[in-house]
Curated annotation (Swiss-Prot):
UniProt entry tagged with the keyword Transport: yes
GO MF, one annotated term: NADH dehydrogenase (ubiquinone) activity
One Pfam family per UniProt: Oxidored_q2
Catalyzed reactions per annotation: a ubiquinone + NADH + 5 H(+)(in) = a ubiquinol + NAD(+) + 4 H(+)(out)
Role of this protein: Core subunit of the mitochondrial membrane respiratory chain NADH dehydrogenase (Complex I) which catalyzes electron transfer from NADH through the respiratory chain, using ubiquinone as an electron acceptor. Part of the enzyme membrane arm which is embedded in the lipid bilayer and involved in proton translocation.
Name listed for the protein in its UniProt record: NADH-ubiquinone oxidoreductase chain 4L
């Protein structure tokens, strides 16, 4: 496995670990999720270019579209939670909490 792919996989794992460790704030979770999507985009683009998958050239673009939609929904949720509660804790999103 080339060193570029290894570094990108390590970046994905680091973002995943950051998502698991720093899950109390919504902003840090969104940043880690964006890092995961960016590393997935770069890895899929490199894989398609290196293996000459001519039929799969649209996959990285679709991944970017879903990442943009995820970022927009996440930021809208962050603004709503911040305006409602004054904090960006994920525990404020629990609907079962009284």
């Amino acid at each position: 496995m080339p060193s570029i792919s290894t570094n990108i996989i390590l970046a994905f794992i680091t973002a995943l670990l950051g998502m698991l460790i720093f899950r109390s704030h919504l902003m840090s979770s969104l940043l880690c999720l964006e890092g995961m999507m960016l590393s997935m985009f770069i890895l899929s683009t490199l894989t398609i270019l290196n293996l000459y998958f001519t039929t799969s050239f649209m996959m990285p673009i679709l991944l970017l579209v879903f990442a943009a939609c995820e970022a927009a929904v996440g930021l809208a949720l962050l603004v709503t939670v911040s305006n409602t509660y004054g904090l960006d804790y994920i525990q404020n999103l629990n609907l079962l909490q009284c």
